[in-house]
Amino acid sequence: MFDKLEDLIHHYEELMNLLSEPDVANDANRFKKLMKEQSDLAPIVETYKKYKECKQNIEDSLAILDEESDEEMRELAKEELKDSKEQVEELEKKLKILLLPKDPNDDKNVIVEIRAGAGGEEAALFAAEIYRMYVHYAENRGWKVETLDADETGIGGMKSVEFMVKGSGAYSILKYESGVHRVQRVPETESQGRIQTSTCSVAVMPEAEDVDVKIDDKDIRIDVMRASGNGGQCVNTTDSAVRLTHYPTGIVIYSQTEKSQIQNKEKAFALLRTKLYDMELQKKQDAEAEERRSQIGTGDRAEKIRTYNFPQGRVTDHRINLTLYKLDKILNGDIQEIIDACIAADQAKKLSNMEHDA
């Protein structure tokens, strides 16, 4: 690990020198690429420098204890030695995490798809609440949310909704939200006070770019039509809505949120590219998970990831056994504590896998 860290420091210094050269500064694309690489390496370099400082402090403290007879100086050296050893242990853990292979999609924007599951109208209402939860969370982070398509019910529910979240590292954070979310509560129409269980599914997909997915024109059918609102009512007098059909996969994309046919077509193709890219990612991840299962006997993914219990004001994430009693705050977008815990658990699992493979 330490040989690799020394190589990274050397490379980091080379990057800093390159970024100061006029030729590089005048080449916008190259400058941007090198700046990104430099900013990715900076946390590793800074942590490793602190680690080396602490190691040096340990050596200095041991030397004082070996040579110094003054009791006050020896006590100070013992305290410094204790603190430095604790810091070295923490910094070594941090370095191992920083050196974990990075998901190449982590920096991408995301497209989120929420679909109401079991539970009828109550499931649609829950899907709408989960949608608003993510919108609030994204807005609190200064991210931009753009609705791509929504199938709304007449009383505020959503049978389905697809939206894009644009922001730095959006996929690295929101990818942990994929899975089935479950709600337990008494519906307003329930006269006996019985608790009903409903579900909605959440799929978080990294936005695919043209370079990620190539779509052949002959594989696509494009239909244009007038946009419609709830109950099929016409909301546009021009053929602005667009429907794409991808023959090889059977995927159908419908976009009508924009007034312009061109904009709806762009949104539809963006969503299609992302879904095709996600299919490829899922195939790869399933193959890797199967390989992991054969190696260490783990890797199964539970379908139900989280329960929102209204009578108890409780939210439980079943993947990490985390329970929080702040349901209202969470539904208002306060999900950072859950996400941080998921990230920590994921990092711990990856470290364990690396140590096992080694």
Curated annotation (Swiss-Prot):
Q: Which UniProt keywords apply?
A: Cytoplasm, Methylation, Protein biosynthesis
Q: Modified residue N5-methylglutamine is at which positions?
A: Q233
Please indicate if the UniProt record lists Cytoplasm as a keyword.
Answer: yes
| Cysteine disulfide partners in this protein | none
Signal peptide positions are: none
Q: Where in the cell is it found?
A: Cytoplasm
Pfam families recorded: PCRF, RF-1
Q: Give the main localization category.
A: cytoplasm
What this protein is reported to do is described as:
Peptide chain release factor 1 directs the termination of translation in response to the peptide chain termination codons UAG and UAA.
Family, per entry: Belongs to the prokaryotic/mitochondrial release factor family.
Annotated protein name in UniProt: Peptide chain release factor 1
Organism this protein belongs to: Agathobacter rectalis (strain ATCC 33656 / DSM 3377 / JCM 17463 / KCTC 5835 / VPI 0990)
State the gene name recorded for this protein: prfA
